[in-house]
């Protein structure tokens, strides 16, 4: 048997990337395909339909474009014979969901529905279902539902049930016309194989499904809304299969589009962050993996099911078979830094960066690195896109305290970096307080590759050594590992994801170790962060929510005046 390869495809927020990997984990070729429609958060494509605040949609055709463009590109770059590619795996943002017709076609691609916002793909960071999430949490708490503690006491507006309920409330006809609500990762697998299966990872973390208990009861859904009573057996029906399972094989049509052979094994869909865990070789407890990009997803393995405040979920076999997989997260990290650079940095900084031939981020990082912890005099709350963990509240907003007339852009930039590190520390503390050890940190994604200052701050704030993924595209490599498992040992792949991870997972030799004097200062700053966190986030002062309410009211008045 000659040398064999697998392909992993990582569907991110703005683009999809394919990586061709050998069975030792060496990356042979990769290609990034930006989504032609990007994130749709203002106006629907091909119409002038304006979207409300907190909406975030996508075009499902963009996902197929990635298959048609990125996969042939890596084959061409590498010169690898398609016959030597034994499997394909994908990972996706989640919960990114869409309504499909009985034919499997997304409703938004039908001419009669394309002007209806609720027919489109709802991206993970669509936060307009917060009202539904609030009511769902109130009802679950009132009824003492057993599932609630598994999700840190709150179900997020980002997840499947809240999004489905929003559709039912705001456009019941779309709900009625929908045959199935699917995670985008499962829909792409369906397009590739013709097989409709749901993966246990998104079902468990995003759709309140439990390996032993299944979905919440019909009685619970009836108490929420009588129209939802049968939602799990109708709109969410379908086989739920574990990670590492073969979903099917490439159809002739999709194989031709992708430049591969019909019959190539396709792994069950996965979540981007979760695929990264084996991607860095982590297959045992005590090692937290941080997938760091526009947001952060924190993942940890355990040997038993425990309840942790504000975690996104604990799912048996949800990350690595044989372990309970814990997930927590921060709703915005890289997005905060990007917002600052794009919206708030003065012109002279951009001009100086251009003159030096560096990006604005690099210019700010270099200058921010000259400051000692505490030297900026600033402290921030990292809630520009709400708080996912531990407060689970998308109505919270960002805050910076300590401004003076002498405050410089690089000081603000550093304060934002530090704020996200404090947010991660808050998550680590929640796990440790619940009896789940966090001994080592692993980081992957775009941020650890680009920003050394950020990683040193995280090491200092958490007082833990951080190991960095060797790959710049760890989720795609992880997806490729699952492809190797789907292909099976008999075809040159692996028997289990643990075996694949031990042979294919890689980290850099360079690590970030905490600096004791920095740790001591950050400990004091973290105590102040905690006071602000609890004051604004736990109900003592709901000013952020009131401001958001007044903003929405003012906008509504303004729109009604413009329409009259």
UniProtKB/Swiss-Prot annotation:
Q: Keywords in UniProt for this one?
A: Arabinose catabolism, ATP-binding, Carbohydrate metabolism, Kinase, Nucleotide-binding, Transferase
Query: In its keyword annotation, does this UniProt entry include Aminoacyl-tRNA synthetase?
Result: no
A single MF term (Gene Ontology): D-ribulokinase activity
Q: Which GO terms describe its cellular component?
A: cytoplasm
Pathway-wise, it operates in: Carbohydrate degradation; L-arabinose degradation via L-ribulose; D-xylulose 5-phosphate from L-arabinose (bacterial route): step 2/3
What EC designation does it have? 2.7.1.16
Say which domain of life the source belongs to.
Answer: Bacteria
User: What's a Pfam family in this record?
Assistant: FGGY_C
Q: Which InterPro entries match?
A: ATPase_NBD (IPR043129), Carb_kinase_FGGY (IPR000577), FGGY_C (IPR018485), FGGY_N (IPR018484), Ribulokinase (IPR005929)
Q: Which Gene3D superfamilies match?
A: 3.30.420.40
Record field: catalytic activity: D-ribulose + ATP = D-ribulose 5-phosphate + ADP + H(+); L-ribulose + ATP = L-ribulose 5-phosphate + ADP + H(+)
Q: Which CDD domains match?
A: ASKHA_NBD_FGGY_L-RBK (cd07781)
Top EC class, one word = transferase
What GO biological process terms does the UniProt entry carry, in alphabetical order? L-arabinose catabolic process to xylulose 5-phosphate
The UniProt entry, under NCBIfam families, shows: L-ribulokinase (TIGR01234), PRK04123.1 (NF003154)
Protein family per UniProt: Belongs to the ribulokinase family.
Question: What is the name listed in the Swiss-Prot or TrEMBL entry for this protein?
Answer: Ribulokinase
Q: Organism source for this protein? A: Anoxybacillus flavithermus (strain DSM 21510 / WK1)
Record lineage = Bacteria, Bacillati, Bacillota, Bacilli, Bacillales
């Amino acid at each position: 048997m000659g040398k064999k390869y697998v392909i992993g495809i990582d569907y991110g927020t703005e683009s999809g990337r394919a990586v061709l990997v050998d069975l030792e984990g060496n990356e042979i070729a990769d290609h990034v395909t930006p989504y032609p429609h990007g994130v749709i958060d203002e106006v629907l494509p091909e119409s002038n339909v304006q979207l409300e605040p907190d909406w975030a949609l996508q075009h499902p055709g963009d996902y197929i474009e990635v298959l048609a463009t990125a996969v042939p590109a890596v084959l061409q770059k590498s010169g690898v014979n398609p016959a030597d590619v034994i499997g394909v795996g994908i990972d996706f943002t989640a919960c990114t969901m869409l309504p499909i017709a009985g034919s499997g076609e997304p409703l938004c691609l039908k001419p009669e529905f394309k002007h209806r916002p609720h027919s489109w793909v709802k991206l993970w960071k669509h936060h307009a279902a917060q009202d539904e999430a609030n009511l769902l949490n109130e009802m679950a708490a009132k009824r003492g539902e057993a599932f609630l503690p598994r999700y840190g006491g709150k179900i997020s507006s980002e997840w499947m049930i809240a999004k489905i309920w929003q559709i039912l409330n705001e456009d019941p006809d779309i709900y009625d016309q929908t045959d199935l609500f699917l995670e985008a990762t499962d829909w792409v697998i369906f397009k590739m194989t013709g097989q409709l299966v749901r993966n246990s990872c998104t079902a468990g973390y995003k759709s309140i499904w439990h390996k032993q208990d299944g979905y919440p009861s019909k009685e619970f859904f009836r108490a929420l809304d009588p129209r939802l009573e049968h939602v799990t057996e109708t709109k969410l029906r379908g086989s739920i299969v574990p990670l590492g399972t073969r979903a099917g094989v490439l159809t002739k049509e999709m194989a031709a589009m992708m430049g591969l052979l019909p019959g190539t094994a396709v792994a069950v869909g996965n979540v981007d962050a979760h695929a990264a865990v084996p991607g860095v070789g982590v297959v045992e407890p005590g090692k937290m993996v941080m997938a760091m990009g526009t947001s952060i997803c924190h993942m940890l393995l355990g040997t038993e099911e425990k309840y942790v405040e504000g975690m996104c979920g604990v799912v048996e076999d949800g990350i690595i078979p044989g372990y309970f997989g814990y997930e927590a997260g921060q709703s915005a990290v890289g997005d905060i830094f990007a917002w600052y650079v794009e919206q708030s940095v003065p012109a002279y900084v951009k001009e100086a960066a251009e003159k030096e031939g560096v990006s604005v981020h690099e210019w700010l990082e270099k200058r921010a690195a000259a400051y000692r912890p505490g030297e900026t005099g600033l402290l921030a709350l990292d809630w520009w896109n709400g708080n996912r963990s531990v407060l689970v509240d998308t109505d919270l907003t960002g805050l910076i305290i300590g401004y003076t007339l002498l405050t410089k852009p690089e000081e603000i930039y550093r304060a934002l970096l530090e704020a996200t590190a404090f947010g991660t520390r808050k998550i680590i503390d929640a796990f440790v307080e619940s009896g789940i050890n966090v001994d080592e940190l692993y980081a992957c994604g775009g941020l650890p590759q680009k920003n050394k200052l950020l990683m040193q701050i995280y090491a200092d704030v958490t007082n833990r050594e951080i190991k960095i993924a060797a790959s710049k595209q760890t989720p795609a490599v992880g997806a490729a590992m699952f492809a190797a498992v789907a292909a099976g040992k008999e075809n040159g792949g692996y028997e289990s994801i643990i075996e694949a991870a031990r042979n294919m997972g890689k980290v850099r030799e360079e690590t970030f170790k905490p600096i004791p004097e920095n740790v001591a200062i950050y400990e004091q700053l973290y105590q102040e962060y905690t006071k602000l966190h609890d004051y604004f986030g736990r109900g003592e002062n709901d000013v952020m929510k009131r401001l958001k309410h007044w903003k929405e009211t003012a906008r509504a008045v303004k729109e009604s005046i413009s329409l009259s």
